[in-house]
C-alpha cells in the first residue's frame, strides 16, 4: 500500500505552495520520505524518538508563527473516516489554530463530519513545541473508501485548501 509519509508529504507540498503563493515563508520538517533522526539512533524506537525530538527542535528554533503537523490515521477498525485537528489545552492560540483548520476542512471537503478540534495532552510535539501547534489528521488509511480518496490528487488539493484557509482565518480572526 501507500505509505502515510508519502501522502502526508504530498499534502504538505500542496499546502506549502498555497502559503508561499500568498507570501508566507514555509519551513518543512522534511522534504522527502526519510525521517529526520540522529545517526546514532539504532533501534526503530530510538529513531522515532529522535525524529520527534528533531521536529520539536525545528519548531522551537525556527522563529515560525505556527506549527502544523500533517498526519493520516491507521487503526485496526475499518469503519472510521474523516479528519480531525488536535491541540494542547494549555495553548489558547494552538486551540484557535486547530478550530480554524477543523472548520475550514469541513467546508473544503463538504462531507458530514461531526468531529471538532480536540485537546490532546499525550502527544510529544503538541506538548513541547512552544508556538501555536496543531496536529491535522487528514483521514484514515485503514478505511478502504477513504484511503482511495486520500490517494487522489484532487482530494489532497481540497485537504490542503482547507488547511490553508484555516491558517489564513487564524491570522485574521
Regions found by a protein language model. Give the residues of each.
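Active-site-proximal helix/loop segments of hydrolytic enzymes
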Residues: 2-173
Amino acid at each position: 500500500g501507500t505509505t502515510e509519509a508519502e501522502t502526508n508529504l504530498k499534502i504538505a507540498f500542496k499546502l506549502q505552495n498555497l502559503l508561499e503563493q500568498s507570501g508566507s515563508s514555509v519551513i518543512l520538517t522534511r522534504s522527502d520520505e526519510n525521517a529526520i533522526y540522529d545517526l546514532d539512533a539504532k533501534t526503530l524506537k530510538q529513531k522515532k524518538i529522535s525524529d520527534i525530538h528533531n521536529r520539536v527542535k525545528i519548531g522551537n528554533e525556527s522563529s515560525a508563527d505556527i506549527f502544523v503537523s500533517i498526519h493520516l490515521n491507521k487503526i485496526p477498525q475499518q469503519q472510521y473516516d474523516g479528519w480531525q485537528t488536535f491541540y494542547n489545552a494549555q495553548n489558547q492560540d494552538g486551540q484557535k489554530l486547530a478550530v480554524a483548520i477543523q472548520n475550514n476542512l469541513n467546508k473544503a471537503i463538504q462531507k458530514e463530519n461531526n468531529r471538532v478540534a480536540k485537546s490532546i495532552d499525550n502527544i510529544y510535539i503538541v506538548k513541547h513545541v512552544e508556538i501555536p501547534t496543531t496536529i491535522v489528521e487528514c483521514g484514515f488509511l485503514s478505511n478502504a473508501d477513504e484511503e482511495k480518496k486520500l490517494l487522489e490528487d484532487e482530494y489532497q488539493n481540497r485537504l490542503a485548501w482547507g488547511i490553508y484557509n484555516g491558517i489564513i482565518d487564524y491570522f485574521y480572526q
